[in-house]
């Protein structure tokens, strides 16, 4: 009786290259203009969360690690925080631009509220961008303070005057920030003051139309 034999043939098939089976992730729709601004794809400094001392430390660390020449791109997502920290980071950006002549670009993502808008004001309007669906919120500075009057009557007016001077100085700082925010835009300073009194939420498209930012990504 003849012995039957079976032959097993194994065929190795290489998978198709990944790029041929996976769709490209770049948005090429007519509504997308991301390709017009390739520098914004990966910001050198990426900030998110509350504007506070921790964010300032992150800002300084990322700035030190960033390239020392060419445009510097900074992105931020924040609901607000300490306006003085925002001003300090903004001054660093301004001094970098003035001393080195480097271009600095701002990219707001999702929310640029309160102190975030203060930081944005450190960038020229033609260097500001927002991602689609983002919003800016601008409001007046807030103060919570209790004045305790204790002592001879003739000395009490000094305490009141000191608090009044503090308020006046805070208003002047606010005015400086408002002027920087609208400088070069279509928004009048008086209009910003009026809207900021009740918190002004500005959608990305409106911000672009008003000239507060150059474009939307």
PLM regions: where:
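Terminal-region recognition feature
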Residues: 2-217
């Amino acid at each position: 009786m003849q012995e039957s034999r079976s032959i097993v043939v194994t065929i190795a098939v290489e998978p198709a290259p990944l790029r041929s089976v996976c769709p490209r992730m770049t948005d090429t729709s007519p509504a997308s203009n991301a390709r017009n601004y390739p520098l914004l794809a990966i910001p050198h400094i990426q900030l998110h969360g509350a504007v506070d001392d921790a964010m300032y430390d992150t800002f300084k660390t990322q700035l030190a690690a960033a390239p020392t020449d060419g445009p510097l791109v900074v992105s931020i997502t924040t609901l607000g925080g300490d306006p003085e920290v925002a001003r300090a980071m903004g001054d660093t950006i301004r001094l970098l631009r003035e001393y080195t002549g480097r271009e600095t670009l701002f990219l707001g993502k999702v929310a640029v509220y309160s102190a975030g808008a203060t930081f944005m004001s450190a960038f020229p309007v033609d260097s500001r961008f927002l991602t689609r669906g983002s919003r800016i919120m601008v409001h007046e500075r807030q103060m919570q303070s209790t004045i305790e009057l204790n002592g001879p009557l003739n000395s009490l007016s000094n305490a009141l005057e000191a608090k009044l001077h503090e308020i006046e100085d805070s208003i002047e700082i606010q005015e400086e920030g408002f002027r920087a925010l609208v400088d070069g835009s279509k928004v009048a300073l008086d209009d910003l003051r009026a809207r900021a009194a009740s918190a002004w939420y500005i959608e990305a498209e409106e911000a672009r139309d008003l000239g507060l930012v150059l474009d939307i990504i």
